[in-house]
């Protein structure tokens, strides 16, 4: 128990969960970002195998999501020197392109906007347990 945040690798990391239509929608985007090595880690909240990519990291304990105050999935973070310097919440193709500084992102037929879903780390039924385990 403590208030220290788990350290994140420099670059871009994203938080997702399978039980979110927006996160399912952007799987092709996550695949592209993984293949191009733009994305460092995908933290998944509810299914350790989602998405099935080599950079997917199990956050079903919600420790990383809770400590980084993730309220919505997907949330894309920019990390420098181990510290979050910026974030974007939900899926907006134009916003993600600008955030990642890339021109082509996702398949042509992908919906360009979806607001995302509530993060499990802010689920009222889990708050007490998460605060006891990981601090406030």
Give the positions of each predicted feature.
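Thiol-based oxidoreductase modules, predominantly thioredoxin-like and allied folds used
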Residues: 37-61
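Non-globular targeting/processing and membrane-anchoring segments
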Residues: 1-11, 19-21, 25-39, 66-73, ...
